């Protein structure tokens, strides 16, 4: 029986499939940095000066917009049912005054702007709650209650935002919910806004763009473990909140980590343009799929002379490629939607978005949209031009800069996305990973190459000496390249690890992009402390996983089969969901797992009958072999041994793999 229990313990293979849905990280309290040299080298200060050249960081217009309509600010913390802190409103109180030497002044300005948190009036009958999460929660007053636009990441912060709003605006019911797009920071807290039972009982309309549920539950399921691990770097979830660590994400302060759920839409907007009346108020929706998200719309509220740009518009250059990992976004399509939106905002006196602060006044609204439209289009067109001239992605990224009319405009600065990695994204979109150089067609794996480079350079001591010279000269990119090879050739080389960590410190402190800063500083932290001890707490995802089709989990299951151990096996397993009244046939052949929704196969090696809730408990590691055999919620017909053998083939990915070492 020991073998069978081992197999079923491995059935928690999917415990990390949705890790990426939380945007990354599992630490509710940030790690403290190890003692490190606090020397900010002159090259970093020079980089700060260069990034601010020609830019008026003292321009008061954005600060006036960020403060406009302020009603009240929250204090204290938001906790979960167990008393764990989900959100601390005072965590970024240190962001004030002049920029410290360890933060790019331009990024510090963005962090100051994002520090304006609380309840704000956008227009008559429209309010926003900012700083309760990385995204905004918007309230639009209908005839009888509040229509909620986006619901943050976590149930706890969404509930806190609603309670705070009601204290100041009155205890009105939720009469509609709008999800602008399929990223979790805009829907994950929905059950903190209104319960599924209340929404159903009162027939509250829940509006979302076409394809919303599939995109919301699928983008991160297959690659969720890898995305979640990488997102720890991008969002700096392990970093301390201080001037040497996390100061901002570029889009907002940070990501809230609590219970994530989903309120299933009752109305899908599937036309290019579609009008709806919600609680007596007219909305005009425009679908923009494949802009910032695969499923997304923007909308106007004509009666309020207001337009919501969702996340297609923001006060930063956004990502065409997100560093946590995802499919590349289409710059040409995104720019095209922004061009169309110039007509959609006709008559609007305010544009509000689901990150950052609004823009008021028709001339400023047009400028806001035009600059973003042209930034994405310029990056696209110039990357294609240089690509057709024979340049590779890295070469284009090194050469490409925005024209000064765009570069000096603060709302398309690279606080989140950057021109450099967006140019590489455009190259990848059209050309993929191969740059056409024969030497790059089948290169040596990185660790093998690293060992040979170190040997070629004269050994570890010689490489370390060269890296010190590069570091002292302020050539931190070259120092990082040398030290990457040295650390990958020998992860136990403490001197190399520390110098690489110090190099990443300098690169992070220099960066204008918050994700770049977070990536570098998390790399430095992990060189000193190692990877996290555990991945995402999966139980927080149960409410979301309930809405994920079984097929999504089976796709992830197929991708977790260890091909080497599966070779030569031929197994058929029936999965019967008694509560869903559906069954799936899984067949393993040629070390490939296929699955079909079909009646149980008569010749199956085993049939496992269970309920969806118990299946989810298995996936999240809350149930194992003992519960499978004794819970009374399952039945096994056929070979128990074959069923255990099948589950033993599935790799468990805890989401704590090393990134800066091997």
Q: What residue spans do the PLM features occupy?
A:
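Metallo-beta-lactamase
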Residues: 121, 145-147, 153-155, 170, 214-288, 333-345, ...
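Active-site metal-binding motif and surrounding structural segment of the metallo-beta-lactamase
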Residues: 144-145, 155-206, 270
């Amino acid at each position: 029986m020991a073998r069978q229990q081992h197999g079923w313990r491995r059935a928690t293979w999917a415990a990390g499939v949705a890790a990426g849905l939380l945007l990354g990280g599992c630490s509710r309290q940030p790690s403290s940095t190890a003692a490190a040299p606090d020397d900010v080298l002159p090259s970093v200060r020079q980089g700060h000066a260069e990034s601010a050249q020609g830019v008026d960081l003292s321009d008061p217009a954005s600060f006036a917009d960020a403060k406009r309509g302020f009603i009240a600010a929250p204090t204290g913390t938001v906790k979960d049912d167990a008393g764990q802190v989900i959100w601390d409103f005072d965590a970024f109180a240190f962001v004030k005054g002049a920029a410290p030497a360890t933060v790019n002044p331009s990024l510090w300005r963005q962090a100051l702007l994002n520090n304006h948190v609380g309840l704000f009036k956008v227009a008559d009958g429209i309010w926003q709650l900012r700083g309760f999460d990385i995204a905004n929660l918007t309230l639009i007053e209908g005839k009888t209650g509040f229509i909620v636009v986006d619901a943050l990441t976590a149930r706890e912060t969404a509930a806190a935002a609603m309670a705070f709003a009601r204290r100041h605006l009155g205890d009105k019911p939720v009469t509609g919910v709008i999800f602008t797009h399929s990223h979790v920071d805009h829907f994950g807290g929905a059950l903190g806004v209104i319960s599924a039972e209340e929404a159903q009982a009162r027939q509250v309309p829940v509006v979302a763009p076409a394809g919303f549920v599939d995109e919301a539950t699928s983008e991160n399921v297959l690659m969720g473990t890898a995305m979640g691990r990488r997102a720890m770097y991008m969002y700096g979830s392990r970093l301390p909140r201080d001037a040497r660590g996390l100061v901002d994400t570029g889009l907002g302060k940070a990501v809230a980590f609590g219970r994530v759920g989903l309120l299933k839409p009752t109305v899908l907007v599937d036309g290019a343009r579609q009008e709806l009346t919600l609680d007596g108020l007219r909305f005009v929706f425009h679908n923009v799929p494949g802009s910032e998200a695969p499923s997304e719309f923007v909308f106007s509220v004509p009666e309020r002379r207001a337009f919501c740009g969702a996340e297609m518009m923001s006060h930063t250059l956004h990502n065409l490629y997100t560093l946590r990992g995802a499919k590349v976004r289409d710059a040409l399509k995104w720019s095209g939607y922004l061009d169309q939106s110039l007509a959609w905002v006709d008559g609007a006196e305010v544009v509000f978005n689901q990150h950052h602060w609004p823009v008021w006044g028709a001339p400023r609204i047009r400028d806001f949209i035009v600059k973003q439209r042209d930034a994405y289009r310029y990056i696209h067109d110039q990357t294609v031009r240089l690509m057709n001239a024979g340049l590779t992605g890295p070469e284009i990224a090194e050469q490409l800069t925005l024209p000064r009319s765009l570069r000096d405009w603060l709302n398309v600065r690279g606080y989140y996305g950057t021109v450099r990695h967006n140019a590489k994204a455009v190259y990848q979109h059209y050309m993929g990973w191969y740059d056409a150089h024969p030497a790059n067609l089948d290169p040596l794996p990185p660790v093998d190459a690293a060992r040979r480079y170190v040997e070629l350079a004269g050994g570890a001591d010689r490489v370390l000496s060269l890296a010190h010279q590069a570091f002292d000269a302020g050539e931190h990119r070259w120092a990082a390249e040398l030290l990457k090879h040295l650390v990958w050739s020998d992860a136990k080389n403490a001197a190399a690890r520390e110098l690489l960590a110090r190099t990443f410190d300098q690169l992070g402190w220099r960066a204008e992009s918050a994700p770049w800063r977070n990536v570098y500083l998390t790399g430095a932290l992990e060189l000193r402390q190692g990877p996290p001890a555990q991945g995402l707490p999966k139980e927080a995802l149960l409410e979301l996983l309930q809405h994920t089709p079984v097929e999504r989990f089976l796709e992830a299951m197929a991708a977790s089969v260890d091909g080497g151990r599966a070779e030569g096996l031929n197994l058929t397993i029936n999965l019967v969901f008694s509560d869903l009244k559906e069954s799936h046939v899984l067949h393993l052949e040629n070390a490939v797992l296929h699955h079909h929704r079909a009646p149980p196969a008569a010749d199956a090696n085993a049939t496992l009958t269970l309920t969806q809730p118990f299946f989810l408990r298995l996936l999240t590691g809350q149930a194992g072999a003992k519960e499978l055999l004794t819970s009374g919620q399952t039945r096994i017909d056929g070979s128990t041994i074959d069923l255990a053998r099948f589950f033993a083939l599935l790799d468990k990915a805890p989401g704590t793999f090393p990134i800066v070492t091997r």
